Regions:
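A short catalytic or substrate-binding loop motif that flags glycine-/basic-rich loops and adjacent residues
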Residues: 74-79
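Surface-exposed ligand/attachment interfaces on beta-rich extracellular proteins
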Residues: 58, 99-110
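Short beta-strand scaffold segments in enzyme catalytic cores
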Residues: 80-88, 152-155
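Amphipathic coiled-coil signal-relay and dimerization helices
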Residues: 91-97
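Short, compositionally biased leader-like segments
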Residues: 34-60
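Charged, amphipathic alpha-helical segments
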Residues: 51-72, 133-140
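Mature secreted bioactive peptide module from preproproteins
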Residues: 67-68, 80-84, 123-127
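Active-site-proximal loop/helix of nucleotide/amide-processing enzymes and allied scaffolds
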Residues: 2-44, 107-190
């Protein structure tokens, strides 16, 4: 696991997510992000503990926080991550999830399991951490896109690009995704 969460537990109005240093003595790395919704990371820690450290997911209506956590986690780990957004009559909720696997991530239904998320999926993004991996949707990704009206994209970590795909085309277009704002803007959420 490549992340360290520091919860301020009432001492602060935000949580901070750190990358891992890669050593056992000093767990916390030198990169971090602030997360305003203090329930997002604490919820992810609870779920991760329940699943022996391998699977986690969290939800928030703060799309900025969700995009920040997704991008930071994708950029600072070897695992695939996903970011889904649901629309319930104008109220949008994001889900951030991982299975801590380098070559697949849980589907949207599995990621939502145990979370109070309502509405229709409007965005489905997952990361491809392998620099030699697919720049766009894999054959499995495209097959899964058939049943969803959501906008689908792969975040390719190596070049920080979102590659939109659908059920018939692995790569419709590439879009710069250097920041969480870029991700939200490119997917029509900002």
């Amino acid at each position: 696991h490549n992340m360290t969460i520091e919860s301020q537990r009432g001492k602060s109005e935000f949580d901070r997510l750190y990358n891992s240093s890669g050593t056992r003595k000093i767990k916390r790395g030198n990169k971090s992000i602030k997360v305003s919704d203090t329930k997002l990371l604490s919820g992810m820690v609870k779920m991760q503990t329940k699943h022996a450290g391998y699977k986690t997911a969290g939800s928030t209506q703060n799309l900025q926080d969700a995009a920040e956590v997704f991008k930071f986690a994708a950029d600072n780990s070897k695992a695939e991550w996903r970011l889904d957004v649901y629309d319930d009559n104008g109220a949008k909720t994001a889900v951030v999830a991982t299975k801590q696997s380098e070559d697949h991530v849980q589907n949207a239904d599995e990621a939502m399991d145990g979370l109070a998320v309502e509405g229709n999926q409007v965005v489905n993004i997952h990361s491809h951490p392998n620099p030699l991996g697919t720049k766009g949707g894999s054959s499995d990704d495209m097959r899964n896109a058939k049943s969803s009206p959501a906008r689908n994209a792969v975040y390719f970590k190596a070049n920080q690009t979102l590659y939109e795909y659908n059920s018939t085309r692995s790569q419709i277009k590439g879009m710069s995704a250097n920041t969480a704002d870029d991700i939200l803007r490119q997917m029509g959420l900002k």
